[in-house]
Regions:
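Beta1/beta-strand and adjacent pyrophosphate-binding region of the FAD-binding site
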Residues: 1-13
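Core beta-strand elements of the Rossmann-like FAD/NAD(P) dinucleotide-binding domain
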Residues: 3, 137-146
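Conserved N-terminal/central alpha/beta ligand/cofactor-binding core
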Residues: 19-123, 150-167, 174, 178-180, ...
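Internal hydrophobic alpha-helix adjacent to the cofactor/substrate pocket in enzyme cavities
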Residues: 23, 379-402
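An anion/pyrophosphate-binding glycine-rich loop and adjacent beta-alpha core
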Residues: 34, 52, 79, 180-321, ...
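Conserved beta-strand-loop-beta-strand element in the redox core of flavoprotein oxidoreductases
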Residues: 125-141
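A glycine-rich dinucleotide-binding beta-alpha-beta segment and adjacent secondary-structure elements
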Residues: 307-373, 401-414, 532-585, 590
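Extended, charge-enriched "interface" segments that sit outside catalytic cores
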Residues: 431, 448-607, 613-621
């Protein structure tokens, strides 16, 4: 059998990768260990969150599936940071972890050009540093022009609880034992990482009166820019807030040596996630904190399971019982699933290009947790980009590489391939230097054109984008040309807001720059036939104009450095006077531009100056 693209692993990265290649006309095969676990949510039952919610919007803008799937299956939706500025606002959905995978599986099974096969991949067929296909557990060989590895946490996975170690993946699934060895034998540097998941308790055993109810927003938000089903905001499922206690902390301190991470097992090499620490880590690292917040999150409308967010641990089961029962509201809680840590192999991500193709093996792409990231959203966006670039390569077209000023997806990939990882990488708004440009509300304006160019956005969707851009321009033009003067009617209205009285005439554009003036106030003077998404863009553009222009100038300055390309075959050993650490890092990362070289830790401006002089000399010759 021969395919254009073979995707290995049916998690969130694999789903986006195989859908992208199939929709771009590639004959695609998805191979996964268990077809019933496609798009599974083995950890938190949510999609989105700070920075991550913006990524889901970016995936949708490019033509990916995660946002649409989350909209169809969410049971609660919230806009985070809505009292802060637009740069940090992001959607978070409480996702139904039974219907989310089912819905995604339906989408995959109906997709043209896509075949789904249940099986384990044992080996890669490689000839002259180029991947040619895969070898299944039963010895069957399947050939393909490109292979995309989206193996998640399954490479040599071990489940850790107390002093026990079981060789298995999430939900007791069979791990991939030989693929990791195959990659090592091909010359890849393999690293060991770790993550964890908390307990699930029975919703009928919780004393809710001891917790604080957290409802969804009363605005019907959606991730997708396209038509998705409307939902009744009054029927959202609540979450509940509770806290650890002094008793919880004492139980953990008294039993710390029984935790896999703190003495239960002495052969752990995996490094855990810095921004999602276990409860043991929190108690040790933040010893001065009297309590830590925990969210009780429903996992599905079809299940009694409640996920205790913020309480992941690798303690033995009997200690977990004590810990859970020390929490207000959970005194009588029945544990349905115990918490555990999981250790797994990844490849060090400086070994991949910005296209997500590996540097060592041509036509081999990697996406998701195999690249050292954590989170469904981080995985999905990599899967989408790997799929797009694999298809573009087969089509003989230029790759799609998103800049740091294009989107959080660009930030994530650039961070991975330029800086590498020490622990599972999580996206944060603080990682983006142009975050005012990379907002939740403008992901379609930033990225939909790219999706259209590669063939994942239809003509109809593209027309809607053009209409939106024209409408925004039209409203901005109207506001700049419409002037009001301090006549009595205007003075009286402005007093009701209240805002400072006018001394002279002013355009509505300049009036809207006042902090207390909203677009709704402007409607008193001029009526717009446009929906709220258009007017929101206009308001943000005007109120943050100075900051946005400054960010754009900085991005353009960086783009000029990105345009200064570094030859692929450059030998850094030939460049005199570069510091030895910088030489080593440049040789390892092999940046494609001066802009990227500047972002490598250990490479300082003096090294960059020497490199630029060397490149100029080369141009002359």
């Amino acid at each position: 059998m021969k395919y254009d693209c073979i995707v290995v692993g049916g998690g969130h990265a694999g789903c986006e990768a195989c859908l992208a290649t199939a929709r771009m006309g590639m004959k695609t095969l998805l191979v996964t260990g268990n077809i019933h676990n496609i798009a599974d949510m083995p950890c938190n039952p949510s999609i989105g969150g700070s920075a991550k919610g913006i990524v889901v919007r970016e995936i949708d803008a490019l033509g990916g599936e995660m946002g649409k799937n989350a909209d169809k299956t969410q049971i609660q939706m919230k806009m985070l940071n809505n009292k802060k500025g637009p740069a940090v606002q992001a959607l978070r959905a409480q996702a139904d972890n039974i219907s989310y995978p089912k819905q995604m599986q339906e989408t995959l099974f109906k997709q043209e050009n896509l075949t789904v096969l249940e099986g384990m991949v044992e080996d890669l067929i490689v000839d002259e540093k180029t991947v040619k296909g895969i070898v299944l557990e039963n010895g069957e060989k399947i050939y393909g022009q490109c292979v995309i590895l989206t193996t998640g946490t399954y490479l040599k996975a071990d489940i850790l609880v107390g002093d026990t170690r079981h060789r298995e993946g999430p939900h007791g699934e069979k791990p991939s034992q030989h693929l990791s060895d195959c990659l090592k034998n091909l010359g890849f540097q393999i690293i060991r990482l770790k993550t964890g998941t908390p307990q699930r308790v029975d919703k009928n055993s919780i004393r809710y009166e001891e917790t604080k109810r957290e409802d969804g927003d009363m605005t019907p938000y959606t991730f997708s820019f396209d038509d998705t089903p409307e939902y009744d905001v009054t029927k959202q499922t609540p979450c509940y807030l509770t806290y650890t206690t002094a008793e919880t902390h004492q139980i953990i301190r008294d039993n710390l040596s029984k935790s896999s991470m703190y003495g239960g097992l002495d052969d752990i090499k995996g490094v855990g996630p810095r921004y999602c620490p276990s409860i043991e880590d929190k108690i040790v690292r933040f010893a001065d904190k009297e309590r830590h917040q925990l969210f009780l999150e429903p996992t599905s409308l079809e299940s009694n399971e409640i996920y205790i967010q913020g309480f992941s641990t690798s303690m033995p089961h009997d200690i977990q019982e004590q810990m859970v029962h020390s929490i207000p509201g959970l005194e009588d809680a029945k544990i349905l699933k115990y918490a555990y840590a999981i250790e797994y192999d990844s490849i060090y991500p400086t070994q991949i290009k910005q296209t997500l193709e590996t540097k060592l093996i041509k036509n081999l792409y990697t996406a998701g947790q195999i690249n050292g990231t954590s989170g469904y959203e981080e995985a999905a966006c990599q899967g989408l980009m790997a799929g797009i670039n694999a298809a573009l390569k087969i089509q003989g077209k230029e790759p799609l590489i998103l800049k740091r000023s294009d989107g959080y997806i660009g930030v994530l990939i650039d961070d991975l391939v330029t800086k590498g990882v020490r622990d599972p990488y999580r996206l944060l708004t603080s990682r983006a230097e142009y975050r005012l440009l990379l907002r939740h509300d403008n992901a379609d304006l930033r990225l939909r054109e790219y999706g259209y160019q590669v063939g994942l956005i239809s003509d109809a969707q593209h027309d809607i984008l053009l209409q939106k851009k024209n409408a925004i321009k039209e409203v901005l033009d109207q506001l700049q040309s419409y002037k009001i003067t301090p006549v009595k009617e205007v003075r009286d209205y402005l007093e009701t807001i209240p805002t400072a009285p006018l001394k002279d005439g002013i355009t509505l554009y300049d009036l809207l720059k006042r902090p207390e003036i909203k677009i709704s106030h402007i409607k008193h003077f001029i009526d717009f036939p446009y929906d709220s998404s258009i007017l929101e863009q206009v308001e943000i553009h005007i109120k943050y104009e100075g900051y946005i222009m400054k960010a754009q100038r900085e991005a353009e300055k960086m783009e000029r450095l990105e345009a200064k390309k570094i030859p692929e075959d450059i030998d850094y050993n030939q460049i005199k006077n570069i510091a030895s650490e910088a030489r080593q890092k440049l040789q390892e990362v092999r940046p494609t531009s001066i802009g990227q070289a500047l972002r490598i830790s250990g490479v300082n401006p003096a090294d960059i100056s020497i490199l630029m002089v060397y490149l100029k000399k080369g141009e002359k010759h």
